[in-house]
Amino acid sequence: MKRIIPEPYLTNSRVLRKTHNPWETKLWQYLRAGRFCNLKFKRQVQIGQYIFDFSCRGKMLLIELDGSQHSELHINQYDILKQDFASKQGYKVLRFWNNDIDKNINGVLEIIKQNI
């Protein structure tokens, strides 16, 4: 059965896929086109009302990259709701800070590998 995604969510998801930040771009170079453990990852994937940075649906894994704004209380509370929703759908959510991508991309990739 085809999923019906409301147009505002679909439009936002499309915009996010076209305009990504440098940290998403860097991680995407490792995940795209089956380069990482021969798995299929997608960017800016909509699940319910939320959009996640990366998903590997075959492994029920979601990856979120967080900048410093995610330490603000209202954004942090939103992230908790988002993660709880994904968990209830059967997904495992991994979160990394942007500086982890800059300073320790190999460590990030190892953590992802351990969780697939």
Language-model segments: which ranges?
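Basic, amphipathic alpha-helical patches used to engage nucleic acids or provide basic targeting signals
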Residues: 16, 45-115
